[in-house]
């Protein structure tokens, strides 16, 4: 009743068919929401969250193409952002972009392409995944690593807390507003900040987040930022919707590197492949994608592109798909020289060739991008694939 009064009948649905349609996601879980809200208004979301809090009902947000372990499910109030909240606004000549949570990676990058820019995060499901999920999961992808992920490229954010409080971190008065509206939250954030900055804890947090890590909350925010609103906005990244709703975000973009050098490095064992990583990283490689023997065999079985995967020298082989992204031909030539120097010292099945030919590198990336579907497709009828990021 509160939701209907606040939002109106056109935005709130109790229809069993609508609720059943959004009940499943790509996980093995099934929860049917009690109410479905579809709106493109931050104030509507704030009203919905405040009403849910008054009635002690859970609220969840549905985006697309993100985590696959039931994060998009609820038996309470579901707010579906995929039909609305799709705004994209280019700022500062493409160096920044304001995005809403219903916009997909592909849609944003297609707008940024004319400026020679793109978003830092590049998850494989970029056609379907929306910025709401990318930010809430701290998605990275194949080339951004820890340097250009969602956390590192966030400039500012508008978020809605469970109480209905709306904070815009681009507003110079945001710290005062947060302190006025949420004094207990601010006190808690400051206490946690001080605890995290104790030497032993700070050293552990620094170590954990010096590598790719999306487990739990981003506690590095307590070390990287000093004020409550900035800390909270960066805790939102990777929080999977548990801290609030991300209504929009301004993201710093990265330059598109037009000169590429790609190679598939084939190793006799998985151990040999992993031992090669430090030298490759030191050489400045942008992308390193590992494929084990099972993955390689599935790729070999592909009727279109399987021929590009070399035959297995025995059981347990592995491969690294590596790629250098460079701003010009000179730096590309230098990268290829560095790559050849490293690979000449590696335990490889055959000598690799670095290429920028789309006819060669395209099929390799097609196989890699479609690898999850191939692996999941081998399961028996009635089985469900369970997967989640563990790093």
Predicted ranges, named:
Residues 2-10, 47, 51-55, 111, ...:
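Generic non-transmembrane alpha-helical segments
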Residues 59-62, 288:
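ATP-grasp fold ATP-binding core
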Residues 134-136, 140-150, 154-369, 373:
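C-terminal substrate-binding/cap subdomain adjacent to the FAD-binding core in PCMH-type
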Residues 45-58, 112-129, 216-237, 363-367, ...:
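Short, hydrophobic/aliphatic alpha-helical segments
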Residues 3, 21, 27-59, 77-125, ...:
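N-terminal glycine-rich flavin-associated loop
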Residues 1-54, 64-95, 124, 172, ...:
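N-terminal flexible segment immediately upstream of the FAD-binding catalytic core
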Residues 66-67, 125-135, 239:
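Conserved A3 ("GATE") glycine/threonine-rich loop of ANL adenylate-forming enzymes
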